[in-house]
Amino acid sequence: MKTFEILKHLQADAIVLFMKVHNFHWNVKGTDFFNVHKATEEIYEEFADMFDDLAERIVQLGHHPLVTLSEAIKLTRVKEETKTSFHSKDIFKEILEDYKYLEKEFKELSNTAEKEGDKVTVTYADDQLAKLQKSIWMLQAHLA
């Protein structure tokens, strides 16, 4: 797979995760509602930024980003969540798994971009990896 193709898959993943985390944000139940509501808002905002950054990088590489949800659904590898009631521990476990998946995908992006001599995408991917690894560490500590 080429760099721009991985970017498109990640763009699809980002928009699906944006919606998935909104579902958690709106439908969390329990005594820690306020904390989880705030935390999930921060997370879905990160996915919105990621979606836009990925699209802009795709354009910079001379390709067209995803512009429809139907395209995103075809390309995503993220499992959508259709339930509408959640407890915080389940939410954070699911987000942790999604972060681990993204970590793997951004490593692939970094390696592929490196092989193609695309230093800008390598830097972007490595920056995302640093953020994801910190988030993974924090969620693992929270769930311990």
From Swiss-Prot:
One Pfam family per UniProt: Ferritin
Q: Which GO terms describe its cellular component?
A: cytoplasm
Phenotype for residue 59 to A? In strain: SS1, G21, YS8, Isolate 96T/THO, Isolate 96T/ROS and Isolate 96T/HAR
UniProt keyword terms in alphabetical order = Cytoplasm, Iron, Iron storage, Metal-binding, Oxidoreductase, Virulence
Q: Which Gene3D superfamilies match?
A: 1.20.1260.10
- Please describe, based on the UniProt annotation, the reported consequence of changing residue 140 to E: In strain: 8826, SS1, DB2, G21, MI 355, MI 356 and Y06
Please tell me where Fe cation 1 binds in this chain.
25, 52, 56
Biological processes per GO annotation: intracellular iron ion homeostasis
* Documented effect of changing residue 9 to V: In strain: Isolate 96T/FRE
Q: Which GO terms describe its molecular function?
A: ferric iron binding; oxidoreductase activity, acting on metal ions
**What family classification does the UniProt entry report for this protein?**
Belongs to the Dps family.
Name assigned to this protein = DNA protection during starvation protein
Naturally occurring in which organism (per UniProt): Helicobacter pylori (strain ATCC 700392 / 26695)
Positions binding Fe cation 2 in this chain are 56
Enzyme class at the top of the EC tree? oxidoreductase
State its Enzyme Commission number(s): 1.16.-.-
Q: Where the protein is mainly located, per its record?
A: cytoplasm
Provide the reaction this enzyme catalyses: 2 Fe(2+) + H2O2 + 2 H(+) = 2 Fe(3+) + 2 H2O
Record note on domains: 12 di-nuclear ferroxidase centers are located at the interfaces between subunits related by 2-fold symmetry axes.
Q: Cite the InterPro entries for this sequence.
A: DPS_DNA-bd, DPS_DNA-bd_CS, Ferritin-like, Ferritin-like_SF, Ferritin_DPS_dom
Quaternary structure and partners: Homododecamer. The 12 subunits form a hollow sphere into which the mineral iron core of up to 500 Fe(3+) can be deposited.
